[in-house]
Amino acid sequence: MKDFAAIDFETANNERSSVCSVGIVIVRNGEIVDSFYSLIQPEPNYYNYWCSQVHGLCHEDTDDAPVFPKVWAQIEPLIENLPLVAHNKPFDEGCLKAVFRVYQMDYPDYEFYDTLVASRRAFRYLENHQLHTVAAECGYCLENHHNALADAEACAWIAREIL
């Protein structure tokens, strides 16, 4: 796959709509040409302990952050006519659909690909198919795991190798 947008969300709690950060990496002709990162005020607006332990974000980080529709207005032109790619598509696509629903936005039915599924086919011998493991197999060192932009960049790297 030569043209796509890798996407990753982090959530504040167990609600898929509670996206608190997003990372996007734009790939054209097999090269990373742009990226985008934003904190987002989650909906519902509370953090649970476990999610904060994973990504390190808390209420204070997103108190002054924009709400999702304002962030998506910046993302939409970047990803126009591009398929989306995520590592564990059900999670990220689920987040996107849930937050669109919460804000009563029309979901454009994005074409979505999954590097997790692809890695299970391409690298059957791996002990696991977690993002950092698959990224390393593809020659990418993921240093800031669970930062949405770092995870989107790792996903883009994987997608360029196996999709």
Predicted regions and their residues:
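Conserved non-catalytic scaffold segment of RNase H-like nuclease domains
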Residues: 1-109, 124-146
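Short, glycine/acidic-enriched loop or turn micro-motifs at the edges of active sites
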Residues: 11-13, 117, 154
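Catalytic-loop motifs flanking and including active-site residues across diverse enzymes
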Residues: 92, 111, 151-154
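Conserved beta-strand -> loop -> alpha-helix junction used to position metal-binding or nucleic-acid-contacting
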Residues: 106-119
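Generic alpha-helical structural context detector
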Residues: 117-120, 136, 157-160
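Acidic, divalent-metal-coordinating active-site segment for phosphoryl/phosphodiester hydrolysis
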Residues: 147-160
